[in-house]
Swiss-Prot record:
Taxonomy, superkingdom: Bacteria
Record bears the keyword Membrane: no
Function statement: Displays ATPase and GTPase activities.
This protein's name: Nucleotide-binding protein TTE1834
Keyword Nucleotide-binding: yes
Cross-referenced Gene3D superfamilies: P-loop containing nucleotide triphosphate hydrolases
Family stated for the protein in its record: Belongs to the RapZ-like family.
Pfam families named in the record: PapZ_C (PF22740), RapZ-like_N (PF03668)
InterPro entries: P-loop_NTPase, RapZ-like, RapZ-like_N, RapZ_C
Keyword list, A-Z: ATP-binding, GTP-binding, Nucleotide-binding
Positions contributing to ATP binding: G8, L9, S10, G11, A12, G13, K14, T15
Residues at which GTP binds: D58, L59, R60, G61
Molecular function terms from GO: ATP binding; GTP binding
Length: 284
């Protein structure tokens, strides 16, 4: 039985996450009151027909905090296993999402959206600390979020339970704050100075071929892959559920994208749970 609670910041993708879980065969309920968890758990753990349940929860309200903790205590006392997925995103991305949907943040009242986001982060900080998986959706599309959840909850992956998130970025836009490991690939020849490659990105085959034709690129990728594979079991041993590997070049469009994709392919081929995203590929 997999009993999953999905919560997090408003606008971080809870609805999309539940849709993804439903596609994976989970019985999903959105906006589920935490106080009813014990009854639902009793029902499903005794059922032979349902073995995967995902509950979407809004935990902003004061009473909900008391309810969720008492309900989690009930699950522990009855040896009911559960997992918590916490979704979050950067302030900038959340503000953009609220503006695009023309929705008001539930905690902003008449104030600014960012004030509501800050208040919600404070209220949810404790539940975030006990989450099994924390997923930053700032740079994830719906399909990438689905892939990340699939890597966690579908069987057959090496070191199931840890997600390897490979990210490319441009140093001119800053190092990703969420990165656990950062690697600088500005030592590689830059496709930017090749006229026909400048308007392309590392997702294009011509740029990929240019970057990976250099011996130093091939050797770097091999050594990087070996190091990551060496480290993963130790991160798992320490209870880490997500490893964010950031690959940086000057603008985040050519070298870092090509190397991030190559690292993703290398790890994916060996059946690790891995996703890739390119933070700055659309920047000018």
């Amino acid at each position: 039985m997999r009993f999953v609670i999905i919560t997090g910041l408003s606008g971080a993708g809870k609805t999309q996450a539940l849709k993804a879980m439903e596609d994976m065969g989970f019985f999903c309920i959105d906006n589920f009151p935490p106080a009813l968890i014990p009854k639902l758990a009793d029902l499903f753990y005794q059922s032979k027909n349902i073995d995967k349940v995902a509950l979407g929860m809004d935990l902003r309200g004061g009473q909900f905090f008391e309810d969720i903790y008492s309900s989690l205590d009930f699950l522990k006392k009855n040896n009911y296993d559960y997992e918590i997925v916490f979704l979050e995103a950067s302030d900038e991305v959340l503000i953009k999402r609220f503006k695009e949907t023309r929705r008001r943040h539930p905690l902003s009242e008449e104030g600014r959206i960012v004030d509501g986001i800050n208040e919600e982060r404070k209220r949810l900080s404790d539940i975030r600390k006990i989450a099994n998986y924390i997923i930053d959706t700032s740079n994830l599309t719906s399909s990438q979020l689905k892939e990340e959840l699939s890597n966690i909850f579908l069987k057959g992956k090496k070191f199931k339970g840890i997600i390897i998130d490979v990210m490319s970025f441009g140093y001119k836009y800053g190092i990703p704050l969420e990165a656990d490991l950062v690697f600088d690939v500005r030592f590689l020849p830059n496709p930017f100075y090749i006229d026909e490659l400048r308007p392309l990105t590392g997702n294009d085959e011509k740029v990929k071929e240019y970057v990976m034709k250099w011996e130093e690129a091939k050797e770097f990728l091999k050594k990087l892959g070996d190091m990551i594979k060496f480290l993963i079991p130790y991160y798992v041993r320490e209870g880490k559920s997500q490893l964010v590997i950031a690959i940086g070049c000057t603008g985040g469009k050519h070298r870092s994208v090509a190397i991030a994709n190559a690292l993703y392919d290398l790890l994916k081929k060996e059946d690790y749970s891995v996703v890739v995203n390119h933070r700055d590929i659309g920047e000018e």
